[in-house]
UniProtKB/Swiss-Prot annotation:
Anything else known: The reaction proceeds by a bi uni uni bi ping pong mechanism.
EC number: 6.3.2.1
Chief place of localization: cytoplasm
InterPro entries named in the record: Cyt_trans-like, Pantoate_ligase, Pantoate_ligase_C, Rossmann-like_a/b/a_fold
The protein's role, per its UniProt record: Catalyzes the condensation of pantoate with beta-alanine in an ATP-dependent reaction via a pantoyl-adenylate intermediate.
Catalytic activity: (R)-pantoate + beta-alanine + ATP = (R)-pantothenate + AMP + diphosphate + H(+)
Similarity annotation: Belongs to the pantothenate synthetase family.
Source species, domain of life: Bacteria
UniProt KW keywords: ATP-binding, Cytoplasm, Ligase, Nucleotide-binding, Pantothenate biosynthesis
Lineage summary: Bacteria, Pseudomonadati, Campylobacterota, Epsilonproteobacteria, Campylobacterales
One GO molecular-function entry: pantoate-beta-alanine ligase activity
Binding site for beta-alanine: 58
Pfam families listed in its UniProt record: Pantoate_ligase (PF02569)
Name of protein: Pantothenate synthetase
Length: 274
């Protein structure tokens, strides 16, 4: 495995490869969910690139950029054992130029609801860095987890509308044995908070149970699910279509249920595709 920090070195190495290339962009603090993406890339491509970059432009002023977990040595070891070909670990000054003027704006509707409403400017930063990383790595396929559903859908939209020649591959959410969606931020949780956080996935199970028994009215499903979340600080629990617009009734094959809540100081996301 080669560890690369320079965009020019990455592009030079990439030009030497003629076969299929998979790309897994991450912010580090790698866990089993990331490893699943890497394994999928390895299985579907001749070469695989992983990036680790805590992107400053997707964090707001009062968010946890400075405290986001960083484990470069452990992450490099995980990538080495997984058979990654190139680990790209740039610094902010390698990705962004002083006085950058060519910016990217998230879609006015789907980019400023849900996470976009809670974190203004977040998806501008996400799309900007993902586009840069895709151009630097020129992958055949790029892998993104469904846990960050809104991010995934917006990246797919960007790829489609900008005619990017890269396949965006969605990958199912990985969970621990209790059902908690894996996240780098789980490291912040105490044992008591981890138990409390299980209410998040439990609320999705509750919603599924009622849908399976024939309840299709979104308001009724939401009401029942929110009872499971009592005691947790819920930011939103929404039932939307694939364009992230609200649905009054469940449409199987077109519905996503998204929940975001705070447990202690930790903000956690989860979702269910129906």
């Amino acid at each position: 495995m080669q560890i690369v920090t320079s965009p020019s070195e990455l592009r030079a190495l990439r030009r030497e490869w003629k076969g299929t290339v998979g790309f897994v962009p991450t912010m580090g603090a790698l866990h089993k969910g990331h490893l699943t993406l890497i394994q999928k890339s390895k299985a579907q491509n001749e070469k695989s690139i992983v990036s680790i970059f805590v992107n400053p432009t997707q964090f707001g002023e009062n968010e946890d950029f400075a405290h986001y977990p960083r484990k470069p040595e452990a992450d490099a070891n995980i990538c080495q054992k997984a058979g990654v070909d190139i680990l790209f670990m740039p610094k902010a000054e390698d990705i962004y130029f002083e006085g950058d003027e060519v910016l990217l704006k998230a879609p006015q509707k789907s980019g400023f609801v849900l996470e976009g409403a809670a974190r203004p400017g977040h998806f501008d930063g996400v799309l900007r860095v993902v586009l840069k990383l895709l151009h630097l790595t020129s992958p055949t396929r790029a892998y993104f987890g469904q846990k960050d559903t809104q991010q995934l859908l917006l990246i797919q939209k960007m790829a489609r509308e900008l005619f990017l020649p890269y396949e965006i591959v969605p990958c199912p959410t990985e969970r621990d044995s209790d059902g908690l969606a894996l996240s780098s931020r789980n490291a912040y949780l105490s044992e008591a908070e981890k138990k409390e956080a299980l209410k998040i996935s439990a609320s999705l199970k509750e919603a599924t149970k009622h849908i399976m028994t024939g309840e299709l009215q979104s308001s009724q499903i939401k009401e029942r699910a929110l009872k499971v979340l009592e005691g947790v600080e819920v930011e939103y629990f929404e039932i939307v279509d694939r364009n992230l617009m609200p649905l009054e009734r469940i449409i199987k094959g077109e519905t996503i249920i998204l929940v975001t809540a705070r447990v202690g100081k930790v903000r956690l996301l989860d979702n269910l595709w129906i």
